[in-house]
């Protein structure tokens, strides 16, 4: 039995009173649940199923009575199962093809039968699960079917039913009954070909539970009942259902007197068999009428005899599948509908499928219904509550990537699915994992298409049912007792689950030993799927599988040695064994068979030296992870020798520290470790092998002490040794084993005492006369003072209640002081580390150490020595750490401050001042410290802004900052400005008075006022007076005059008049002009600029011949450009007279130098000035009418008397510009006309093109429009390609009223994927913006070719709303600002007067022209390419 989650939250009680709408709503809610939640819960339940009975088809056991357990475990047949044989080929080519359509889709392409072969399984599922199904041909039955067709004209097989016997129906009305014994003999041949000629082919078969009766349904509608014991015909039923329809299904229920049949009319009938006074009768009752929806699949719930008392069986449930929904009804005690479940949209050609099976959910056995159509399988659990009501719970979805034509339960965990291309898929139901895929095209499966089309009665069935029948094979597949039988046109095949041994052996036969071991291990761990044949509890099952795995491992080892390549490079052999040997090691260790691994397997693999080496290397990861202990001495010795021979000494060291080396030669291992510098391994061997902890220290000290005492630099190797020594000492003093693990508890005190005694030795064992006292502590202090003291500090943490340890602690401290204080070999940093260590120890509340205070005074004098400037920062940092560690209590604070100030230890001063809350003095510390002086700003800001300081403290800091403001500004002006803006905003004028240096004041004001400096200051909150801003502007004029204009553009809060006076004072004429323009005095600003221009021109005029890059000429050009820009900025706001007052003086100023004689002006400057004058003319042409310009030039006294030679170039340039603009306008107009012509041609081609529908059937009713016979219905084709009957479209309410006319909208486009789009389209249509694209036309058979009205209707082409919509889209596509502006320009009515160039009209200059529009953009692009 199996456990599954019972989803109470989606459970729905379904009863007869429940309306179909409520049922649909409840199941739609259930369908929204994610399938993944079910998968996850099933995976959890899978691991709880431990017990599997070998009589089961892999149904896990639960805590229920044995009788309930056996219900799901026993096979249905009582007879001994027949022996299956391997598939063989039959010589059946002589059979004539029959008129009935019973051949499979795949059989038509099968070709020569001798080429049929079984399809290979998918590699992934095969390697993971092996071959799950056994696929065999029933030779005896297949041969007799072929023989019957040949000798007695039985016809081709059409249906099969299996119980204790196998019944096969034929196309000529015979029912062949075969035994399920080894011989597969023909027991009975029921019926005759004459009756078959009258009734037609057998279309359905059913055998009752005790295998005593057989029901046969025929293609022409008759039903017969046979006694399988005697072969007698008991009943011939001809009036059970309406005539003219074939029997599609006939099913016995658990009640032998009750059967259900389903005909090709879609109706379902209940058949009740009675025997009154020796007369056998049959009463028929219609359960479901085909007029309400055609049922094409029925499945009654069958229960085994052991489940006869199940509360569900008394209802005699029947599941029916129509083309639109699923129904579950109860036949007893009275007819009642328990559930309806609609399908939803799906492929109309897919086959509805139903299948029942009893499963165990939460220790209760209940029936589960699987139903599917297409590629989704739904599972419904049916159960009864205490009140007697039936509840149906949606369990899960099974989403597939193929369409199903058959669904079969093989047991409660495993299902077998057949898809539309005749591939079998074995699925684990709980995890939805596909275990195997098998192709069965060689079966040549029989299909029931002819019966669904009811060809024997004239084909009077609906097209929908006929379409489903194309793939129907209900009667060709039958399951019984965990076996599935497949009926082919000339054979019968059977499939069943392989036992676990067969699956493993199947892989072994295919030489897949690795996969076989992996599969066997999954059986061992209980993670395999579809397991058959394992019995007993978990330990018994594991033992059985383990024995089989050991056999495979021996075979695997022999194969590894035999398959070894005899020749070739050694790398080839190594690769071979690296692929094979790790598998043996892995599975031996997984099975916890070290005895097998290190005896038989090792001995076997040792025959080959390469295999032996690979074997030893495979042990390494298990040893390093401590998963392999207890290695035999021989293997351990071989392992070390192997790695040593391969020069892998680091690996040897890593292995030794994880091994039990007591069985090895200790001295030999130590010698090897020392020679190869394996210090960790050496220490481990001493500790574990000899319980010796001091000898490793002595060996390491002998190496690192001499160079340290000599003052030499240690090598990298010696540094590594020193670090290992420190860690080793730390571990010993902490009770930890080195390099891993713990020292045995009984040895911890002894080891600590030994290590302390060793460290405090006065002299070493082999001391020389020159050796200083306490050599070991001295060596460690020289090696790494800080780390050695850290080791001691960690050790002292444990010295709380141990009196002897406390004595050791004091003794070591005294030795440290004696060694370091009385010796000058140590640096200040090292001495400081010692006293910091001591200060921390003395500061502890439970301190027991005693240190003379005068030693701290000596250290203070040493660190603050003013005579020694070396290592200043180091000395200061050491003293600071000492104070922070609690050493301050050892000093007199006033003396400490004096010495710190004298030594310029400003961080020490800050530390002391902060303790006394003298924050203002800390500012001096920052300002005097060159390394930290810029941090003073953040410090002042934090004191003044962060809460926690008193008002007096803040005031003292504020005043101190104010006193040093000039120093702060000189240090960092922008930071000082930000500080002032934040904390001194009300005292800015005081700050300015304190800044006597004008350069500093300028930098400060620029940082404060110029937003471009990047400081984050809110100018509104500052409330700076205009006087300060003007003071800054004046300083700016002095120190950086070139930046005045740019600064004025971003500055605020200054007075124009006063600022103008400042700029005039410093003769900054451009700035003055800018301010006058800002003031509104345009003429005044212009006069200043004009005066500057004239002065520049005068300089050029009086200069001699110069180079082309004359700076004076460049000044003229720059000044002229600025003057032009001034005129252009302000001309829009001036009248014509005021514009002329600006532009004409500028023009005269530029032309004045040209009036002089040519000898007065260098030729080079003459050409340059003419070019600049032309630039002025081009600029003023946008604001001054061209006739006015010419008139002003001609009125000049110089040119008015006929001297036009000097200005000939200017006039010709103006005319060239006019010609260019006129040509540009004509070209643009031509391009637009061509573009418009092309667009209209393209539009005309688009709207007159015919529509090509995507399909030839209505997208709503799915019927071809040519076959519809009801009425002369119109066909509507949309531009999207969808086609509809107008009647279908009208039923879907896809019409919109628009200006009194009915307009259509495409149903699929507006509602299928675009929710709410139809309503939006309706509103758009009513507003006249869009129109649905459609073409109405009548079918050809509804209209006469010579209909004059049709010709008249097409004589006048008129744009319909669809074409208007297309035209609007085209206009929007090619719409642009420049083209619209140009079209507007061209569309204006022009009189001959206004259109004449150089007309004398002054009142309407070309200000409205597109050429005067600054936003006008001409976009010239080729037309887009379209497909024809």
Swiss-Prot record:
Pfam families: Beta-prop_VPS8, TPR_Vps41, TPR_Vps8, zf_RING_Vps8. A zinc finger (RING-type) spans 1258-1310. Its main location: other. GO terms for cellular component: CORVET complex; early endosome; HOPS complex; late endosome. Residues 1331-1343 have a biased composition (Polar residues). SUPFAM superfamilies: RING/U-box, WD40 repeat-like, YVTN repeat-like/Quinoprotein amine dehydrogenase. Residues 1344-1354 have a biased composition (Basic and acidic residues). InterPro entries: Quino_amine_DH_bsu, Vps41/Vps8, Vps8_central_dom, WD40/YVTN_repeat-like_dom_sf, WD40_repeat_dom_sf, WD40_rpt, Znf_RING, Znf_RING/FYVE/PHD. It is found in: Early endosome. GO terms for biological process: endosomal vesicle fusion; protein targeting to vacuole; regulation of SNARE complex assembly. PROSITE patterns: WD_REPEATS_2 (PS50082), WD_REPEATS_REGION (PS50294), ZF_RING_2 (PS50089). Residues 1330-1356 are annotated as: Disordered. The modification Phosphoserine is found at residues 26, 32, 127. Keywords: Endosome, Metal-binding, Phosphoprotein, Protein transport, Transport, WD repeat, Zinc, Zinc-finger. Belongs to the VPS8 family. Plays a role in vesicle-mediated protein trafficking of the endocytic membrane transport pathway. Believed to act as a component of the putative CORVET endosomal tethering complexes which is proposed to be involved in the Rab5-to-Rab7 endosome conversion probably implicating MON1A/B, and via binding SNAREs and SNARE complexes to mediate tethering and docking events during SNARE-mediated membrane fusion. The CORVET complex is proposed to function as a Rab5 effector to mediate early endosome fusion probably in specific endosome subpopulations. This is Vacuolar protein sorting-associated protein 8 homolog. It comes from Homo sapiens (Human).
